Amino acid sequence: MGRTNAMVSDIGSGIPYSESVFKAVLASGVNFIETAETYDNGRNEILIGNSINKSERERLFITTKVNLSTGLATSTDDIVRSAEGSLKRLNTPYVDLYMMHQAQSVMKVADKNFHKACDRLKKERKIKFRGLSCHGTFWWQEQGGSIEDILMAAIEDGRYDVLFFPYNFLDPEMGERVIQACKSNDIGTMIMKSNPVSVFENYEKIINQGGNLSILEKKDYERKRLQMDKAGNFFRKYGMTDMTELKKGAYLYILSNKDVSTICCRFKNFSDIEMYIGLSGTTLDNPTASLLSDFRESLGFLNCRIGCNICEQNCPGHLPVNTILRYYYYSQALKENESSSALYRGLGDHKADICTNCQGHCEKKCPHNVAIRLLLTDAHRQFSKTT
């Protein structure tokens, strides 16, 4: 894990969902644990704290995060108290890595209160290292550069030991540039959002929407018809009825990059343990590489490249496109519709209902030809069912 010199499992534990599954994950050999104070309002940290035996603490690498955008941690003392609250919930005297959660601008990278708090916490031996995570900018709130700008600024800052960011086979170039810069500066890397959304279900849902579409949506759908036909050919070619093989391939793609420290996987059940742990130490083979390439060519238009933000900068309605499609990713790829809907409600008036009658300024600027309006309107339709 970069300059930390820690030896971490290539498959790490993202948000755990139950003590029994999490204990089985640890028993399988995983020693990297990722959480945050905001995950399930701190209950996720409590779950971890209740699951870990004190005798195994030294072999584990635990990271948690503080969110500076909630308004609850606005001073050095606030951040120190947040860290101490995390330690209490995690039932540990220290965490190996304390991170700034969701850095939203280049300016945030140098946040004085965060760094002062980390210096104090390190001196008190309550944290060992500091890090930063980034999903992309909140361009609609603060024009703070791209996700790559933020990550590169963190590398240049020199105080961050580990970075946590999206990297996947759909749009690897940015991630690989950041990974190489991290390697050159001896910074560890944690990877998130490595697998695509469940496009098979999306594909069937969109195909069957028919008369439920508005006039503009129907026109947009007709423009996508050739792409949808190509998507159908992909599923028929591989006889695919679910995303299992694609998920495996997506993780193998990351594991094949030996400059990546760990991938954070969400183990929801014992079947996930069997699948993800079985991938540890393996790399991508040619047939699977071809599968991923065909998927990118045939179905890349149904997958937003989270963090790109180019489209958001061109939205006349100042819609948080990247954020909405990140919530959509949580719902589609991680099957977390209830929590994703709650996050969507938290956006207030910044909802994707305005996209129904828009001319598609976002899509015209998207370098990946993503069906942004189609995804946004589907996200709004889906999340509004539970609002």
Located regions from the model:
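Structured C-terminal cap/extension of enzyme domains
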Residues: 1, 23, 31, 159, ...
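N-terminal binding-site loop/beta-alpha segment at the start of enzyme catalytic domains
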Residues: 1-60, 93, 123, 153-158
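Hydrophobic faces of well-ordered beta-strands that scaffold small-molecule active sites
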Residues: 9-13, 33-35, 60-64, 95-100, ...
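Residues that line or immediately flank small-molecule/substrate-binding pockets and catalytic motifs
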Residues: 15, 37-40, 99-102, 134, ...
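Glycine/proline-rich, positively charged
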Residues: 20, 73-190, 207-209, 216, ...
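Structural motif corresponding to the early beta-alpha repeats
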Residues: 39, 54-77, 101-104
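Short gly/pro/ser/thr-enriched loop/turn and capping motifs at secondary-structure boundaries
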Residues: 40-41, 138, 169-172, 196-200
